[in-house]
Each structure stands twice: as structure tokens, then as C-alpha cells.
């Protein structure tokens, strides 16, 4: 039968009633580290989960578990014991009454392991747990050369980024249904929207975001089984398809651990203006995919799905320093802030005596870098002037111009979108904005280190997406708690009526 909606106020009353019953003057007591967990779930309203999943339940049959309580229990699992599995978590719900109460269950009346996985399937909403079919042709094993310390793998196909961007310019990109769309819609409406209203994402009319990829190891080696009996017949190397347990995964290079791994390449987009480094959009790619290739797909998908504001700037590291990426972001009306990946130490020559440094800064005939002097929007060009002038004063020993305000020079964005950025790399504004790029790295660190993302031991893209999104929900819950903890007095509220 259909689940009955339990409002967040009803959940809060249930928590008060159960804590007063079991933790007031009895054997069970609450310690100081319990209160942050209680407060985090107290401020998190996910009652709409029941409305979202109502269509997945039939009109007849036994009464189901409250979907909001199931999701709340999984979030509590990630907040307290993310390294264990669901089976052990059910044991924890029986062992610790507080966990059952905070989930929304009465102590002793706990859902089983199968009930949790049934809930995950309803939350997922698709028949397929992976993008690719499990039965595929046998993958060829190639001996891969180990890369140097800190070195990252390069794209397999040279020029692939430019080809993808040109294809997007030529044919466009219609919004297609992705396997993670249901989770993102829920995450955006129930978590991103709340954080936005609290002012935790930054200015929504001019939002800054940062993107970066990180390895997600799901297994050390690919696992597969034969679909034929050739081995029994003595045929060792047959070409029949094999059954892969993780068809969406492949092998890639982890530059931080300096080893090859099997799994995904998680590309994360986070808010660079958020003081809590809050994540916005995750995308799982094959492990062999390069950051620049992942960005092309992730940025287009994010621009089609994010509806809470307008992205004005995108902060990326030097791995994304490709001319095609600048053109793509400019086409999406997003200003790129990308660190240069030095390809030469020589200056570029121009039609006059001015040269251009590898960083895109004009250099006068005296060998000094010029300073930015405003951007002309009408002609889409950046103005530069002599760095030794201040007003009408010029302290240069060999001035290269007799102009009253010193030598000036203009660079046009259309000439080289990579070198001549709208905001000059040498300006203080660039440095102030770009120093927030590491916010996405801190966000990834929280997911992988604090919440033990790779401890999932899952075998399907479905479960990895559910784990990732729920960890992102926990990151937002942590931020809400930090904003509201000074005004929360739960101890007085819960035990005020007990003597």
C-alpha cells in the first residue's frame, strides 16, 4: 500500500517522546558527542521523500516503512559509521536505541537489510543498475607504463577535447535522461535550495563554481566471469563475451597514490563562493578519462540541470588548459579562470615592438610587464598601460612612448582566448578569485577521507551514485548545523518537561 506522509514536525515530536522515554533518568544516557548528531537530523527536513517515492508503491499490500525514515537512517549511517556495511548497520540500529530513534524507528522495530536495498531501488527509479550491459566483449589487456610521481595520464585520443566541443557547437546538445537525474532533482530541490536560501552557496545571480576530478577506486582489478564452457574444453583464450561485475568501470592512473586502479573517475563541481566548500554536481566517468574530457560532458550537463541561479565563472586547474574549453565556457556565457599549463618559456611576438609572455601579459620594449588598465566591453578588448606610470607621471628611464599617460596596448579576446582572458591573470582580481579553486579539492577530500567514500564496496553504478549523493547531502547538513547550532537548545527543549 501507499506510504503515509509523516511531517517533519511529527518526526521531531516522535524524537522528543522517545528520548524522554528511554534517556530520561534511566540506564541509557546521552553524552556530549551525541548532541551534534541529534541536532543535524533535527534541522533536516526530508519528509518529501515519501511524496517523491509514492508512485513506486502499489495501492494494495502491507504497510511499507516510511521512506523518509529509511533515507534518514542511511544519512545517519554515513554520519556515524560510514566504513561498515548495511548488514552491520542494521545490527547497530538494534544495539544503539538512539540510532533507531533518530532514524524514525521505535527501538526494536527495525527494518531488515532487504528493506534497505528495496528502498534504494525505489530511490533509484530505473530498471538498470549500470549504464553498460554486464555481458561485454573481453577487454584486451595492455601492459601500461607506470607514470612518474605527480604525473597525470593524458587523453587517449589527441585532440579529443576539441572534437567534442566542435561537435557541440555544430549539433548542440539536447538534454538527455541520465541515470543520476532522479537523485540530482531530489538533491537540488531539498538540499541545494535550502543551502541557497541560507546564503551558503554564494550569490545565485553570479555564482562561481570550481571543477576537478578525483579517482574513485572500487576494486584493484577488473572482475569478470566466462559465459561459455571453453575453459572446460581446454581452450584458454577464447573470444566469447564475459560477465563483468562492474561494466561501467575500467582502469586508470591515480597520480596521488602512484598506481593503477580499477573504478571510476569522479568529476565534481562545487561552489567556489561557499565558505563550507559545498558540492553541487557529481558525475561518474570511466577511470581512464582525463579531467578535460570529463569537464566537457559535466559542464554541459550541469548547465542544463542547475536551475537555482546563473553560473558566471568557472575555476579550473592547469589540466583543463585547452583552447577548446575556453571557447566552450565562453559559449555557455561563463568566464573561465584556468591556470596556464606552460608549453613554452619564449615570448610571443606581435606586429610591433610589444611581446606577449607565456602568461598572456604584454611586455614593452624595455622588458617590463605592462599592467591592466580596464576592459572595453563594447570592443571586447583588454587595455594595458606602462607599469611605471602613475597618472601623468612616468619614471621609466627609456619611455617607449611620448603619450601623456604612457604607452598603451590592447589585447583582443578573439585573437587568443587562452592567453587574453577577460580578467588578466596578472591582476589582483584574478588572484583573489582563483585562490578559491582549491575549494573543490577540499570538498573531494571530505567525501573521500571524512566520509570514507571508497569504503562502499559496491558493485553497481546505482549504489555508488546513491552513496555519493547521500554523502553530499551530509556535507550540506553539516553546513546547516554550523549555521544554526548557536540558536539550538535541544537539551532544554527535549528534557524540559521531565523532572
Regions found by a protein language model. Name each.
Residues 93-94, 353-377, 413-461:
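Short amphipathic alpha-helical "interface-anchor" segments enriched in bulky aromatics
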Residues 85-104:
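DNA-recognition alpha helix
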Residues 430-499:
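Basic, amphipathic alpha-helical segments enriched in Lys/Arg and hydrophobic/aromatic residues
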Residues 1-70, 76-79, 107, 119-187, ...:
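Dynamic "connector" segments at or just before major functional cores
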Residues 219-220, 228-230, 234-244, 252, ...:
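Long, low-complexity, polar/charged, intrinsically disordered or flexibly structured peripheral segments
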Residues 91, 124-314, 318-331, 339-341:
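Polybasic low-complexity intrinsically disordered regions
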Residues 73, 89-90, 107-119, 205-216, ...:
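Short, conserved catalytic/metal-binding motifs centered on acidic residues
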Residues 292-388, 424:
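An internal, acidic/charged active-site-proximal segment
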Amino acid at each position: 500500500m501507499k506510504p503515509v506522509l509523516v511531517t517533519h514536525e511529527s518526526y521531531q515530536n516522535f524524537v522528543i517522546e522517545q528520548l524522554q522515554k528511554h534517556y530520561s533518568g534511566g540506564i541509557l544516557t546521552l553524552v556530549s558527542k551525541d548532541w551534534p548528531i541529534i541536532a543535524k537530523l533535527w534541522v533536516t527536513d526530508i519528509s518529501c521523500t515519501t511524496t517523491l517515492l509514492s508512485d513506486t508503491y502499489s495501492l494494495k499490500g502491507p504497510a511499507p516503512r516510511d521512506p523518509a525514515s529509511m533515507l534518514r537512517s542511511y544519512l545517519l549511517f554515513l554520519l556515524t559509521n560510514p566504513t561498515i556495511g548495511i548488514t552491520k548497520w542494521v545490527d547497530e540500529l538494534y544495539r544503539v536505541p538512539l540510532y533507531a530513534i533518530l532514524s524514525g524507528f521505535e527501538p526494536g522495530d527495525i527494518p531488515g537489510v532487504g528493506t534497505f536495498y528495496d528502498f534504494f531501488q525505489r530511490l533509484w527509479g530505473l530498471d538498470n543498475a549500470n549504464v553498460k550491459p554486464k555481458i561485454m566483449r573481453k577487454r584486451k589487456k595492455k601492459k601500461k607504463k607506470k607514470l612518474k610521481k605527480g604525473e597525470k595520464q593524458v587523453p587517449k585520443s589527441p585532440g579529443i577535447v576539441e572534437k567534442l566541443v566542435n561537435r557541440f557547437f555544430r549539433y548542440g546538445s539536447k538534454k538527455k535522461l541520465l541515470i543520476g537525474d532522479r537523485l540530482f532533482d531530489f538533491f537540488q530541490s531539498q538540499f541545494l535550495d535550502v543551502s541557497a536560501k541560507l546564503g551558503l552557496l554564494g550569490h545565485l545571480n553570479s555564482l562561481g563554481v570550481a571543477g576537478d576530478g578525483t579517482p574513485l577506486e572500487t576494486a584493484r582489478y577488473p572482475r569478470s566471469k566466462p559465459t561459455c564452457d571453453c575453459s572446460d574444453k581446454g581452450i584458454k583464450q577464447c573470444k566469447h563475451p564475459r560477465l563483468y561485475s562492474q561494466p561501467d568501470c575500467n582502469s586508470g592512473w591515480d597520480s596521488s597514490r602512484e598506481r593503477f586502479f580499477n573504478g571510476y573517475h569522479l568529476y565534481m563541481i562545487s561552489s567556489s563562493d561557499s565558505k563550507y566548500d559545498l558540492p553541487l554536481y557529481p558525475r561518474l566517468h570511466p577511470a581512464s578519462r582525463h579531467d578535460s574530457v570529463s569537464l566537457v560532458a559535466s559542464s554541459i550537463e550541469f548547465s542544463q540541470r542547475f536551475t537555482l541561479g546563473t553560473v558566471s565563472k568557472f575555476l579550473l586547474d592547469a589540466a583543463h588548459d585547452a583552447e577548446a574549453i575556453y571557447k566552450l565556457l565562453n559559449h555557455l556565457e561563463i568566464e573561465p579562470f584556468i591556470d596556464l599549463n606552460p608549453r613554452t618559456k619564449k615570448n610571443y611576438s606581435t606586429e610591433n615592438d610589444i611581446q606577449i609572455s607565456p602568461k598572456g601579459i604584454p611586455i614593452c620594449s624595455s622588458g617590463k610587464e605592462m599592467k591592466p588598465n580596464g576592459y572595453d566591453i563594447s570592443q571586447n578588448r583588454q587595455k594595458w598601460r606602462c607599469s611605471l606610470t602613475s597618472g601623468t607621471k612616468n619614471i621609466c628611464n627609456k619611455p617607449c612612448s611620448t603619450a601623456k599617460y604612457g604607452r598603451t596596448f590592447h589585447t583582443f579576446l578573439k585573437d587568443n582566448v587562452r592567453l587574453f582572458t577577460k580578467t588578466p591573470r596578472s591582476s589582483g582580481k584574478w588572484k583573489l578569485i582563483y585562490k578559491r579553486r582549491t575549494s573543490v579539492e577540499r570538498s573531494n577530500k571530505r567525501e573521500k577521507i571524512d566520509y570514507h567514500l571508497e569504503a562502499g564496496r559496491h558493485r553497481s553504478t546505482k549504489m555508488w551514485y546513491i552513496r555519493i549523493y547521500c554523502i553530499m547531502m551530509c556535507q550540506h547538513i553539516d553546513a546547516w548545523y554550523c549555521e544554526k547550532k548557536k540558536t539550538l537548545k535541544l537539551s532544554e527543549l527535549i528534557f524540559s518537561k521531565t523532572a
